[in-house]
């Protein structure tokens, strides 16, 4: 490992040593010796020692039931500790000093100055900067909340140990604390015994805000200010909020029957309670600090003549926040309310105005340094989080709205709405939207499903404007899908305009998105209410599952490009909302590269993107890590707007059209066309066992009796990642490139790699995926778990994978994958030593469980779940 990563190597070794001591104390030296023997055999196996590989297989296939859990836990926990050390490395003082990122804001501002980009243009672009991250409860976060706190504490210890001026006693004390935390993690059950409820998931999301983002947002704003002042001599306005958060947790009911209107109501109250509690803590600090006596005459006239004028204002806010916390606490505990709503804070302006007045008065009285301290941080938090803590998105599938309207139209004698032609649906919806009379009959009793839809809309109607950020329609296909939701909201009593966002997910829907939006923009009623602003969500996971990575990527690019052009032509401000996952098969890519590969002008109104599952923890779980993530997002958005990527040449488009068609055909010929594929998939991966893992609150299938098409994108990806074939992330992509090269297009493809960020990012993503695949392990799953008559399919896929790797290497002109990113290659090689035993153990456990499905051994089931979470940690992504 290079010298600049010596801190990381030392930390990994130290944490591994402490884990070994913990295991020895808890389980005895014999177990530790067994674990160490497996580790050495795995290392030698990876180095090409066939005898070591055979011995490793023999050791893991004959392991006793009482030893499987500690062995699985040891390797799983080591991989978690490696992740902690790697996450800390990104914010380590020594690492930051040694590695100046050319992707940072600081580097971008220097580059803009060097390229003589006008300062006014930079400043105006920064003023419009918006990074809106949407936290989602997708069941990819396999780490329990009870462990997350311990992992954060381990990070803090690593940070303190990096100080050079520690005494021997201080260093010993910190290392002892590390050992305690690792022991606590070891003695904590890492597998949930029950699925989390949506409210449990909401608590997890709130914890991320409280423990990390609350500090990270003002820290990032301060950092942005420093760069602006240094390079352009200006300050970022306190009124602006470059970072905002929304959440799907408690609002996303697509396919999740456990998210009800009551769930949404409860989560909204929990958010308000926590926001009031967090602001109360800030205000208490301010009330102690602001003992200043001087203020402006305007301030004194507004708030009274007091010896300590700021303290009086702040203490008044403190009293209101105390009552606000108590008010929402009583609701959450189902207690009768004892507090008058006139005595609590319900609107951000009630908190903002007095604090902003304090800020301005301090500035005008020559106390800028005081104003720009904790008070400024608090103002930034009001603009970012507000009294609702985060905005909430509502999401539901289009068919649910259609069924609700069909029930209504049948009851009032108009026939079945779902059977009408699209033109008739639109005419009916526009007529009802324009009418002042209600559509819903007074004494009508809807079905429970329709009642739930209407109740959700009523919960929205009860919220102040802005608390609910938008209503997303998954599987949106037509203009009537959007108008239908507007009508349901109107009938529920929503008096303000709420953005209704179509989510285009499948290949066909992405290709039709321009036509759907054109129809909507041509509806007079619709243009009248949207105020020339439109949000459209682009689905990455379902389109990739539908058509393969390459075809989906190109469809997403073209859809965005067409929507940008359409909205510019129509005079509509477009915000594109990206529904990405953490994995390549679900649209994941390093944030900076992914954003610079977007179509030109697609980020001019900011970025809205989902942050999912374990990616929230990796990218936002620590304040300093979150600041780095914001910095990368901000620099990519600003670069995309100030130094936009090139428009693709027509020859590049022609190649991409060809690659899209051929890759989709190759992908579908396997996934849909081979009758043996589904039984092969179900036996070669732990897909069926995954459904038993109590990850998220949402069921893993839309239809419990369906095939691959009914499986959600997340378990689809997760299952293939477990057996190291990682099929969804590459199937069809490189094969289509190889076909195109054979037709004589190599020169054009190499030009695309060099000059087109969209294409080079796709190639880089494929290279990353290939570096995590393993044909030997995949074959081991087949030989032990798959019927012999299906082996041909796995063999064919592995041969294709190896050919695809050669194709990508021929484009990079390298002998090894990831040659240009040696640190990542090193990291994967290190992890393989610990992930391989988990894969081999998983095969053995699956074999044992499937041999006796009627009477599963609880220890075997528990160990299997540990291998699943451990492999997820080793791969650094799940779904």
Curated annotation (Swiss-Prot):
Role this protein plays: Forms oxaloacetate, a four-carbon dicarboxylic acid source for the tricarboxylic acid cycle.
Q: Which family does it belong to?
A: Belongs to the PEPCase type 1 family.
Question: By its UniProt entry, which PANTHER family does this protein fall under?
Answer: PHOSPHOENOLPYRUVATE CARBOXYLASE
A GO CC term assigned to this protein in UniProt: cytosol
Top EC class per UniProt? lyase
The protein's required cofactor(s) are namely: Mg(2+)
**Database matches in Pfam families:** PEPcase
Q: What is this enzyme's catalytic activity, as reactions?
A: oxaloacetate + phosphate = phosphoenolpyruvate + hydrogencarbonate
- InterPro entries in the record: PEP_COase, PEP_COase_bac/pln-type, PEP_COase_Lys_AS, PEPCASE_His_AS, Pyrv/PenolPyrv_kinase-like_dom
Q: What is this protein called?
A: Phosphoenolpyruvate carboxylase
What's its EC?
4.1.1.31
The record's HAMAP family line, in alphabetical order, gives:
PEPcase_type1 (MF_00595)
- Name the residues annotated as catalytic in the UniProt entry: 138, 545
Q: Which GO terms describe its molecular function?
A: magnesium ion binding; phosphoenolpyruvate carboxylase activity
**Keyword field:** Carbon dioxide fixation, Lyase, Magnesium
Give an example GO biological process.
oxaloacetate metabolic process
Native species: Histophilus somni (strain 2336) (Haemophilus somnus)
Which parts of the chain span the membrane according to its record?
none
